[in-house]
Amino acid sequence: MKKRIRLIALAALLLANVHLFAQREKLLKNNDVEGLYLTLADFKQDKLTRPTDEQHEGDKIKLKQFFISPDIISIEQGMETKFFKDSIFAIHLINGKNYRFINRTPYLIADTSNLYIYTYKTTKTVFSTSGPHRRSKEVPVTYYYFSLAGEKGVYPLTLANVRKYALTDPAIHIAVCDKFTTDKMLEEINPETGNFIINELILKLKK
């Protein structure tokens, strides 16, 4: 009976790990990358740098463990070019998504309609106590950040930071603070447009 319970517990743990892996940002393959935005100006102008045309044998972009390595290597006709992640603005994928590197960490550029809003998916350990036993489990979590029009300064998406850095107009400041009363509310997205509601409100108030 005890052996059966252990097997059931092990199966549940394996299923949880599979689900957890699906929640993480997936490691990208070399052929996921279409090009690079070397600067913020390039990103705003949609000026994509394609370091390789992939027309020659061996042409490729090597992400070198995309989520932890400090650089990206492109190979074009046998010649290597190194791009440091902290010196370029973003990487553009063939699926249309863009990641901005902040301290070498890839943040998905989720919305640029007003504030630049970024998301970062990872996991965190949660502990619980049941009688004499203390258990831990990994749960998926998404962190939200923002910057002003893609500028260098990036801040956690909280009411305190939005008030401090983004709401310089008194009328907009009051309207935003009246509508959003918790940090969690700032994460709300309009399902029809895919944009963050705070961005839509600020744009509406600016008209």
Positions of PLM-derived features:
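Generic N-terminal leader/processing signal
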Residues: 1, 15, 119-122, 193
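Bacterial Sec-dependent N-terminal signal peptides
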Residues: 1-28
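Generic low-polarity alpha-helical segments
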Residues: 21, 80-83, 195-202
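Aromatic-patch recognition
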Residues: 26-176
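C-terminal partner/receptor-binding element of secreted or periplasmic proteins
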Residues: 171-207
